[in-house]
Regions:
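Pyridoxal 5′-phosphate
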Residues: 2-487
Length: 487
């Protein structure tokens, strides 16, 4: 039986491409670079808005998706903040390792030795990419949420957080004592509030987001690091949204004779390495002093019927068979992103976001969300509402009629959405595979929605909006009976 994916792929291949390059007749995206994957071609590469040079090759840039009205269109992915497609170098690394995949550590077989070397080399690559200090270690986890829950088991005291955090950096800290500071209208006043909280009562940790997963606003990490250390606290940066867009140097803010960022957490699946691994980087002493996050093989040096002798970090918190392929993928992503021209990447994303924000300003009834009135920096994330349209209905319309993927809902940040005065929003996020043509298509689709309404009828069932009837292969009304997601 043919799967839905194979059916869609076969149908998409029957569409005559608008442009063809000289390499194997690949489809070229309108207004973007050729999507050919030939080694001597800038395949799957979006070009810099400033220089026109290829930035990076990203899987799926030539994906063609069905439209509800019939036909196919190249997918415009504005959901990078949820999960990013794989960099070509990441899939190459995984494919290279797959034939040698085996259980790591203690295996004498050739494949096991190769896998072990690759796994530990991945740890070194990640440490190098973020400029680890001598007393910091890299622990491989499942994702950012896993990393933060791990650290929450190790903190020897209270943790101070803001009320604008993703749930992953809000909920775990209740185990040892969480103190919530309400963010102010400005970043400057928010820093004053954090300092007042740390002055009033000592805390072990300040846990803060590097960039908001809802609005993309970047917090001043240098000032926050200095503030935490000034009052005897350590700092954790939730870099799930920051790491894919900016290079992070843990020692960049180190005071003379002191330390920089103490702990850093991020996910592979947002870092163009969607193979199920995450990272916690941090100072060894707390990690060594805490009980293991999970008890099991690999986390011990010796076991008797009466007691266990736990290994030091990172092995202490990596019990069980690790995700070798995921670790290798994260390392490949870190190496690839570190080798890119950071300024070119930042300028490219800023150009896209300026174009998107300026365009949204011209669409009647659109309100862009913002936390701080004085924020001057952001990554490639924009959240907005459209008067008269539920966010889920807007997202369904964009997908069904225009082949555009966005995210809608509350983005695992309920307190922040409540603070912003909305029950939900639409989030558009850009990445290395986003083109100017994608942004223009999104803006045109929103203008048509506000001006003319949707061309299709939409119904709400099973926790989501869908076109009725649903004509796209693989997406049937039967799927609407799935349990709704309330995140």
């Amino acid at each position: 039986m043919r799967t839905a994916v194979s059916t869609i792929a076969a149908a998409a291949e029957t569409v005559v491409p608008e442009q063809v390059c000289s390499h194997r007749g690949c489809v070229s995206r309108s207004g973007a670079a050729c999507t050919c994957a030939a080694p001597d071609c800038a395949g799957n590469a979006t070009r810099s808005c400033r220089t026109g040079e290829p930035i990076a090759r990203v899987s799926g840039c030539d994906l063609r998706v069905p439209l509800v009205q019939g036909g196919f269109r190249t997918y415009a992915n504005f959901d990078y903040a949820a999960s990013a497609p794989a960099l070509a170098q990441v899939t190459d690394r995984v494919n290279e390792l797959l034939p040698y995949y085996a259980s790591v550590h203690r295996g004498a077989g050739y494949a096991s030795r190769i896998s072990t070397d690759c796994y530990e080399a991945a740890r070194v690559s990640v440490a190098r990419a973020v400029n680890c200090a001598a007393d910091q270690v890299v622990v491989f986890t499942r994702n950012t949420t896993d990393s933060l829950n791990l650290l929450a088991c190790c903190v020897p005291g209270d943790t101070v957080v803001l009320d604008i955090e993703h749930h992953a950096n809000f909920l775990p800290w209740t185990r040892r004592g969480r103190r919530v500071v309400p963010a102010a209208e400005t970043i400057a006043e928010t820093l004053h509030r954090i300092e007042a909280e740390l002055c009033a009562e000592p805390a072990a940790l300040l846990a803060i987001t590097g960039a908001s997963n809802v609005t993309g606003e970047v917090l001043p990490l240098a000032e926050l690091t200095a503030l935490a250390h000034r009052h005897g606290a350590r700092i954790l940066i939730d870099a799930a949204q920051l790491a894919p867009h900016r290079r992070i140097d843990l020692q960049a803010f180190a005071e003379s004779g002191g330390t920089g960022i103490d702990y850093l957490a991020f996910s592979g699946h947002k870092l163009y390495a969607p193979f199920g691994a995450g990272v916690l980087v941090g100072r060894r002493d707390w990690l060594d002093a805490a009980p293991p996050y999970l008890a099991g093989g690999g986390a011990v040096t010796a076991v008797t019927t009466e007691q266990a002798h736990w290994a030091p970090a990172p092995q202490r918190h990596e019990a069980g068979s690790p995700n070798v392929l995921g670790a290798a993928a994260v390392a490949a992503a870190c190496e690839t992103l570190s080798a890119l021209d950071e300024q070119a990447v930042v300028e490219h994303e800023r150009h896209l976001i300026r174009r998107l924000r300026d365009g949204l300003e011209t669409v009647a009834g659109v309100r862009q969300l913002r936390i701080f009135s004085d924020s001057a920096d952001s990554v490639g994330i924009v959240a907005f509402t459209v008067d008269g349209f539920e966010p889920g209905r807007v997202a369904a319309y964009l997908s069904a009629e225009f082949g555009i993927g966005v995210r809608d809902g509350r983005f695992c940040a309920h307190p922040l959405l409540h603070r912003l005065g909305v029950d939900g929003a639409v989030r558009a996020s850009v990445g290395l595979g986003t083109s100017v043509a994608d942004v223009d298509r999104l803006l045109e689709a929103l203008r048509r929605l506000v001006r003319d309404g949707a061309a299709w009828n939409y119904t709400y069932a099973g926790g989501q909006w869908s076109p009725l009837p649903e004509t796209r292969p693989g997406l049937t009304e039967a799927a609407h009976g799935a349990a709704p997601c309330t995140l």
